[in-house]
């Protein structure tokens, strides 16, 4: 009589991730795996890092192990337990799936209850017969790139005008800075709060826009940059009582070429920056072409390390029309964009008017509002009070030369840029218990302490909420309305931690 093959030798099973994972969230049998709200579109998934948070004894009841068993990659009593591999398998499945989108990528440091937030996408995956297999994925990638050039969004070239003064070229080739140590900039003070901001979406004359957007700024007496290293419990109320200590002008910028590792840097210029790809240098005589010279000039990385020849060709097609660039401008506590370049730019973010999968373009030479710190603080207060179900968004995504948002995953776009206002991220991480502090973690800059009364009131209210949370004891039951504070995570706390 033939004996059945050992379980460990059985081939892995093909399992549809979406129905299986949705069923597991509904089952409530895995600690921390639960819906964010009643709409069942967003869910928390615990994401503990064993190397950071120490060993855990909850590994026998995790969604990662369940997925390994479901797909036949782990058999109890036969295979050796490997929680790290289980986690990697599920992470890869989520990243490849079109049914899920990562909304919140988890903490940067060591909170007591780390997690991620995923969205269940309404757009289902492509039919099985159209899904590329591993064998022909590279071939289909080449075919897809071959079809991209006619669809690239580049503004029609304008008729040449009067001859301009010769461009000045840099003396040396510009090297990509993020391969070096991230820059630390001692910034001059930010523009005063009395500057008036034109209504977003209104076209403006170039000279008028730039004179209003970026007035000459002279250092003020007493302006200083301070490195602080107190404990998190001491620093948080200090920052909320003295909001001028927050890096309000800092932006984290992350460049991403399709399929390539992202390259990131932090900008600390209070007049912000211009994203460009060119060896032409901005001069005082060419403000209408390239914007003010006081902007930090941030160049896109070279595409030369893109291995695919076709992808590199199409990427260069877009970079070649990014000479004039995209200006990111901080005015007061708001972030704006002005598109100068011929390459069309699409975006998504907190202030985007288009919702869902409808493309959202940035009109050329029109100031577009991207982010409002005041609105973010209002939403953060409501979230901490339990009056809203999700934390306020603050990340901004740009897609160059292709429509966005649309049904195509962001990872498939040729050129994308993510922009994060550092102050917003810090505030959310503080109230999530996700931010650890060290002497070299951040250089906090004091530049303009005269903030509007309304913003001061917002910080005072946030400070009051934080103090109230310190007196709360951890609860043993899952809260009806999960929050992100250090004292109350989105799932019950366990004495031995979570795997």
UniProtKB/Swiss-Prot annotation:
The keyword Lyase does not apply. Maintained as a monomer in an autoinhibited state. Phosphorylation and activation follow the following steps: innate adapter protein TASL recruits IRF5, thereby licensing IRF5 for phosphorylation by IKBKB. Phosphorylated IRF5 dissociates from the adapter proteins, dimerizes, and then enters the nucleus to induce IFNs. A motif (Nuclear localization signal) lies at residues 12-18. InterPro entries: Interferon_reg_fac_CS, Interferon_reg_fact_DNA-bd_dom, Interferon_reg_factor-3, SMAD-like_dom_sf, SMAD_FHA_dom_sf, WH-like_DNA-bd_sf, WH_DNA-bd_sf. Phosphorylation of serine and threonine residues by IKBKB in a C-terminal autoinhibitory region, stimulates dimerization, transport into the nucleus, assembly with the coactivator CBP/EP300 and initiation of transcription. 'Lys-63'-linked polyubiquitination by TRAF6 is required for activation. Residues 121-142 are annotated as: Disordered. Keywords: Antiviral defense, Cytoplasm, DNA-binding, Immunity, Inflammatory response, Innate immunity, Isopeptide bond, Nucleus, Phosphoprotein, Transcription, Transcription regulation, Ubl conjugation. A motif (Nuclear export signal) lies at residues 145-155. It is found in: Cytoplasm; Nucleus. It comes from the Eukaryota. The modification Phosphoserine is found at residues 153, 294, 302, 432, 436, 438, 441, 447. Residues 14-122 bind DNA. There is a cross-link at residues 412-413 (Glycyl lysine isopeptide (Lys-Gly) (interchain with G-Cter in ubiquitin)). Its main location: cytoplasm. Signal peptide: none annotated. One of its GO terms (biological process) is innate immune response. GO terms for molecular function: DNA-binding transcription factor activity, RNA polymerase II-specific; RNA polymerase II cis-regulatory region sequence-specific DNA binding. One of its GO terms (cellular component) is nucleus. The keyword Glycosyltransferase does not apply. Homodimer, when phosphorylated. Interacts with TASL (via pLxIS motif); interaction takes place downstream of TLR7, TLR8 or TLR9, leading to its activation. Interacts with MYD88 and TRAF6. Transcription factor that plays a critical role in innate immunity by activating expression of type I interferon (IFN) IFNA and INFB and inflammatory cytokines downstream of endolysosomal toll-like receptors TLR7, TLR8 and TLR9. Regulates the transcription of type I IFN genes (IFN-alpha and IFN-beta) and IFN-stimulated genes (ISG) by binding to an interferon-stimulated response element (ISRE) in their promoters. Can efficiently activate both the IFN-beta (IFNB) and the IFN-alpha (IFNA) genes and mediate their induction downstream of the TLR-activated, MyD88-dependent pathway. Belongs to the IRF family. This is Interferon regulatory factor 5. It comes from Bos taurus (Bovine). The gene is IRF5.
